[in-house]
């Protein structure tokens, strides 16, 4: 499959977010000093990073009900009749006695970037993942959206997941998701040396979670006591999150479940994309699309392999 097949109109829907995501809200909120944004493409470690930052902020919190109460998602719209002004007002009304942490799948300029000294002191924890792995994880995740949620938004299930992985890739996979993954990093890569941007790779988090969680703590400025570190590491482990996966499934966001149980915390692996449908041909097509978007060779290599990006 050639990368040219992802051009709009060839095999599936045009690029763009699903109807339950509104990218405008993050441009309208009143940003504050101390705000933290967890900016990650879909299925690239978003939930893990949200929980990491929350656990660092609290020194270890096993009792929260839904991570989306603790780390609100700047783009999610709970109902087609939701009033965007009201959703923005809710973000602005969040208490001032605790630093806000937000989730976003966006990159600048969709997500406003406040350069150091040029506005509110906002910190951006930016995570990327091997594109093959992210796309492999996306199809089962989309398939796990509840019938009620898809019916509410009038989105046909077969239109987003396809009959098999080849059809999924020929549709929104190559039209929207792969360009989004590479476009996200293309926007953040030039900002990686900014003092308020931390670029982390999912594979590095997996290879050495404790070192990278400490790195995130240093970056965002949360001081964790020696006594609290064991709890932070436990509550951010895959085993703990899998055992408490109901805390990570958007249960408080809408009036009924958005996801089937088990949709968010699935495998947490690296190097296993072939198990979910990434053939050598699809992998080559992903890379071909990627090179047309992410033209910096160093950035392209880092996108796939990880290791520190701050050189």
Predicted regions and their residues:
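Short amphipathic alpha-helical segments embedded in low-complexity Lys/Glu-rich regions
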Residues: 233-234, 303
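Short acidic/His-enriched helical or mixed secondary-structure segments at domain edges of catalytic enzymes
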Residues: 234-260
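PAPS-dependent sulfotransferase catalytic domain
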Residues: 2-200, 255, 263-311
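An amphipathic alpha-helix signature
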Residues: 132-135, 210-217, 226-230, 283, ...
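Short, surface-exposed acidic
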Residues: 64-65, 221-231, 241, 296-299
């Amino acid at each position: 499959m050639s990368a040219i097949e992802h051009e709009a109109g060839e095999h599936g829907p045009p690029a763009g977010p699903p109807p339950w995501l509104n990218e405008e809200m993050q441009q309208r909120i009143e940003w504050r000093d101390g705000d933290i944004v967890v900016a990650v493409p879909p299925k690239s470690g978003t939930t893990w990073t949200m929980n990491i930052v929350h656990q660092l902020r609290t020194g270890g919190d096993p009792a929260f009900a839904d991570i989306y109460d603790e780390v609100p998602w700047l783009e999610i719209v709970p109902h087609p009749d939701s009033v965007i002004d009201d959703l923005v007002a809710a973000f602005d009304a969040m208490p001032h006695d605790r630093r806000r942490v937000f989730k976003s799948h966006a990159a600048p300029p969709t997500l406003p970037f406040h350069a150091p000294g040029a506005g509110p002191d906002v910190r951006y924890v930016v995570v990327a993942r091997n594109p093959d792995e992210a796309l492999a994880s996306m199809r089962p995740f989309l398939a796990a959206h509840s019938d009620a949620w898809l019916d509410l938004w009038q989105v046909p299930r077969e239109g987003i997941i396809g009959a098999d992985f080849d059809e999924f890739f020929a549709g929104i996979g190559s039209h929207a998701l792969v360009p989004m993954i590479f476009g996200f990093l293309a926007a953040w890569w030039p900002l990686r040396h900014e003092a308020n941007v931390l670029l982390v790779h999912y594979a590095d988090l997996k290879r050495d979670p404790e070192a990278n969680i400490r790195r995130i703590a240093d970056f965002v400025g949360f001081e964790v006591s020696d006594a609290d570190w064991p709890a932070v590491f436990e509550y951010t482990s895959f085993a703990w999150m899998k055992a408490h996966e109901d805390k990570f499934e958007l249960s408080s966001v809408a009036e009924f479940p958005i996801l089937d149980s088990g949709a968010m915390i699935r495998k947490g692996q690296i190097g296993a994309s072939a198990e979910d449908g990434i053939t050598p041909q699809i992998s080559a097509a992903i890379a071909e699309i990627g090179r047309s978007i992410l033209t910096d060779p160093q950035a392209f290599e880092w996108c796939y392999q990880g290791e520190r990006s701050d050189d």
